[in-house]
């Protein structure tokens, strides 16, 4: 059984994301003075006592205005309540009871989810009790004074949260999910792709650039395997981004790449590969992440029987440093080939984690040398490749022992990597090759001897 869910509900700027960061001991949720920073529902792992649960942060609820994503935010909040064991309702003690709080209370009474009421921004016990008193009128039960910033009162609220969670023995052991991040420029269809994969309105979709500001985690199961899908904020050039919610969202996106098992790089079929797409591809390769390139909006392209192969050739020419990544042409709008993403991503993750024996590595290297000898300098010095071994996975990394790394230029190094791929596979993952010379090995041995003597 999946971990129970605790939904955080309230109007804009009452401190919901600050409380989420407090409960989850992180700074994943974006906190900013500007109201409406959180739009989609975002999930994090929460812990209290011996219990684990999911905390879902929702956008600020507004019921007297239907502009700028507000209806969609309400829909996202309702979906969060449908799956939650309890809703933790946050109000602002400093500002006091408002008509917006009363509208939210009325909305919650129409839901089946139990509620707990927390009065935030109560920085002292005496002050907090006085501030909380007026919120009894909401009819949501006892108001608990808390300070999300300083942590005061949160222990009492969490103790109450645990009383609403199902018994611990109903929760089974969870297999660690494969983490798949959906990466791309603004408005290439990342959120639409996530919704198509999940079969629900998981993320707010809009033609307005920058609709997704935070990273959105979604846990699903495909082919009996758990996946954690991460929809990220669209990444623009840094000089095009003002300091604020979008800036923090982009930083979260880069962090999502770092903690992913596999990245889905989404390209707009109508725009082709842009300079920013190339930068993102370079970041994925640099961070050593497995990758699948998804060309979205394929339904909008006029095509014949040769269009796909011609387009793939054109795209790969600009994404040459991801030549190892599989490419899939999809339409989030129609659902075309969307499910195929999982098969390609699972294969890429498998290859990313794969290890091969030293004997197999050296069989491939021996064959590479037989087809093409290492280069010789004008002075008559020739590179010698003695042997190689895999030293790490995630990504697969190999150390090649040679007489002098300087004798092996980029062209021959690319040849060796290509031959390793042809002989061993590793589709969907970058490879790291480390070239170690005799002088470097001798120096390391001498250092080890000296350290042993001192010991």
Swiss-Prot record:
Disulfide bonds: none annotated. GO terms for molecular function: ATP hydrolysis activity; GTP binding; ribosome binding. It comes from the Bacteria. GTP 2 binds at residues 184-191, 231-235, 296-299. PANTHER family: GTPASE DER. Belongs to the TRAFAC class TrmE-Era-EngA-EngB-Septin-like GTPase superfamily. EngA (Der) GTPase family. This is GTPase Der. It comes from Synechococcus sp. (strain CC9902).
